[in-house]
Curated annotation (Swiss-Prot):
Key word Kinase present: no
Annotated keywords: Plasmid
Protein name: Uncharacterized protein y4qI
The species this protein was found in: Sinorhizobium fredii (strain NBRC 101917 / NGR234)
Keyword Iron appears in the UniProt entry: no
Protein family membership: Belongs to the transposase 25 family.
Amino acid sequence: MVLPVADLPDDVDALKAMILAMAKERAANEARLAAAAAEVARLKAVEKSANERIANLTSILKVLQRTQHGTRSERLRLAVNDEQVSFAFEEVETGLSEIQSELNRAAGDKPKRAPRPRKGFAAHLERIEEVIEPEVPADCAGLEKVLIGEDRSERLDVVPPKFRVIVTRRPKYAFRGRDGVVQALAPAHLIESGLPTERLLAYIAVSKYADGLPLYRQEAIYLRDGVEVSRSLMAQWMGHLGFELQMLADYILERVKEGERVFADETTLPTLAPGSGKTTKAWLWAYARDDRPYGGTSPPMVAYRFEDGRGADCVARHLAGFSGILQVDGYSAYTNLAKARAKTGSNETIQLAGCWAHLRRKFYDLHISGVSQAATDSIIAMTELWRLEDEVRGKDAASRAELRQEKSSAIVASLFELWEKELGKVSGKSKTAEAIRYALTRREALERFLTDGRIEIDSNIVERAIRPQTITRKNSLFAGSEGGGRTWATVATLLQTCKMNGVDPLDWLSQTLTRIAQGWPASEIEALMPWNFKPDAIG
């Protein structure tokens, strides 16, 4: 700022003071400019770092999005493990949120934008009202307050599971002038003279067999709350639980076999060999029934069976009494069972239906590696098959078969024509030839869905039932023993069936264990099934 000469003071000291003040102001301005320049440089550095990380995460996100979207040749959703994809999406979202928080912090105060509308929390959740009253201004002290409105917001909170002790007191009474004593009977419990309530047993079982939390981890978690329950004791409780629930699991398997179409699959379940301390390979077989895709009204369910082998004798024993469609992958045990039944002229006939998802995976690997144009063409055609399946899902069997005959059959015919031609062009030892032979040798089973609307294009229903058990297996390392494997199969049967029916497994199991302890009659076992569960009946 330049002052006119006339405005300058005549006094030397005053003039010096003015000059000194102007110098200080200039220095302060320069300091502010330097600080602003430093802040700009810092923000640019933060922005550059954020942009680099965003670009990296965005590239990952694009790859993941191709698992569900993209061109037909790029879609991967049937070849990628759903759990892996979900986990990757979660990690990307977490990374992006961290960057956004960093940018918000770097930007400091900024105008608040209008909040995005969001879906409210479920109505059944408990609401804890917290009213925050404003401070009364000094000049309004003593005046009457008039409520003219309020702002209301909700945040989701959690109360971690808390242990408590149920103290049961049963007073004894005597009557003057009369002999004897009266006292109420002790309530029945599944573990007599033991520590746990039925709800604690249910909580441990759901944590282990539904949520994949091994007993040794539960032991450590409970210790944080000062509760000492050893894993060996919990294992004993689970064994008793398996014994009590076996009848229910057997009943579900029988209900599964009443279906017109059953899905089957199997997965390994390592088990400790007696005496040696080494793990041996055992198997968890799964049999699922779900008629909803073709408009059926029967409840969905799954039954698991533990075996130390994987032979055809296992599946023959499990499916004794079943006659109908068996939808499976290409494993020979199922084929051998169907052939054996046909050879003996059994009334319990089995029609095998193939799984196009298993076949697709074989061609998908070749498509990704770029070694086979036929594989890429196959993937494109198969993607169209699944798109057509989306159109018929939930319709009745006749409508499904009609649309498949109209649109899908030509695609399937062209695929088998392509594979037959390609097989003569490639090396018999190549992966392409291996994939083609897999398809050609199972052609009848793979084509069966075209004429029967009850059949699905894949066996993903049972694969989804197997997946939670593979997660539990990974976390637990092994089943512990043959008895532990049987208990696993029994409890998992019931808890997974709960999930398939949209029932809270903890509420169902708590109620069911209480009823069993109280002597629920075996003749009314149907009322205990997850699909008949009524939450308001919990005691």
